[in-house]
Amino acid sequence: MEYKAPSTAAITAEIEAQVIADGWMKACGGDTAYQIIKDRLQVYLRRPDDANFEQIYHCAHELSYPFPLTEGAMNEFRPLLTALIEPLDPRALRALCGKITDVIYSRFSAACDDNPLSLTPLAAFIEKVRRTHVTRIYTTNYDDFILQAAPDLYTGFANVPAAGPQQFELREFWERRDDGSVFYLHGSVHLGFPHPMPEGSEIGDLHWFHARDEARKHARFDGSDVSRMDGAQIMRTSVVTGLDKLSRLQQRPMSHYYAALAADLMQADIIYVIGSGLTDLHLNSWLREARSLSPAVPLLFIDYWNGHFLEATAFDAQRKEILLFHELRVYAKGPFGGVRVGDHWTLSPDGTSAIWDNGFQHFLAAQDELDEILSRMKSVA
């Protein structure tokens, strides 16, 4: 967000404005479906501002599959939720899902060119880590700021400025475990579905486009969906959104990214978790496993609180703080306490984790303080 990629609230407002103004949305009923879902969520969640685009997309996607079935349909192709709900028009919901992903893709792609901040501090930090460790970055962001800062990082695709789409390197991905890399767990503004399909590719394969403008032309997939175990399906998308992301990570290359994430976390010398609200439970599960090892993998949590972490969370533990404690095993508050180091670091009593509370840009500018906290942590290789 510091690099001006849109916040959840901003992208939600942008999606709503474009859905309401879009002629095709009006013609197919997508605007009405959006408003119905939003209105019901606002009542259900009790606070109007709590309904965001991921929740709306999730509802639209899940409700879009209760289509009429023929009498002889096999049970595995009968979406189970159909028996329990009275559906909205599935065509309108499907169109709405497509529109939401289009807006996300275009807005984040545009943000990559509008960053007002220098990427030099980010580049310096990545280079610093790479001098001492094999650096494997897993991001849930769609933008390419990391690649702008470190263009030579491996993505699972050939690192050359090719004019056309590039296929995922299925074998090379697993052979290049020691290369500095960045992997886009939830998709990227460089991914798309090329048409016509390149020779040797399969239906629904995501490809990498060096030019974002070219990738944007191929952002949407208009072919078949992917079947799920409950009889419903998953729409193929170049950026993964909604609340149920894990089932969407079964497409290539995300399935390989997620498998490698598990191995890397369990074998890591140190883990940096930067700017995460800890809302992706499929990622928390592997962070928890790495932190459950004996000794635990050292972890640095970089985020922002309004004030020093220990003071800001002394009497008010929100979902993030609860997950930080129970899932990531960062015992730096409550009965365990925490050791204040400098102005913005908190070191857990067991010495295996630390929290920075003053935002990412200030973290990048305070590398001497990072060196100090690393020297005080246990088991940092």
Regions found by a protein language model. Name each.
Residues R136-Y138, S181-L185, Y272, L300:
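Hydrophobic/aromatic beta-strand patches that form the interior of the parallel beta-sheet core
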Residues Y142-D144, H186-V189, L278, D303-N306:
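Short, flexible loop/turn elements at secondary-structure junctions
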Residues P87-P116, Q148-A259:
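Active-site gating loop/helix substructures
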Residues L147-A149, P194-H195, H282-N284, E311:
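Short glycine-/acidic-enriched loop or helix-start segments at secondary-structure transitions
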Residues M1-A17, M25-T32, I37-K38, R47, ...:
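SIR2/sirtuin-family catalytic core signature
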Residues P121-R130, Q166-R171, N284-W286:
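Short alpha-helical segments and helix-capping/turn motifs at coil-helix boundaries
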Residues T132-V134, D179, A268:
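Short, well-ordered alpha-helix to beta-strand connector turns
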Residues M1-Q148, D152-F157:
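Gly/serine-rich nucleotide phosphate-binding loop at the start of the catalytic core
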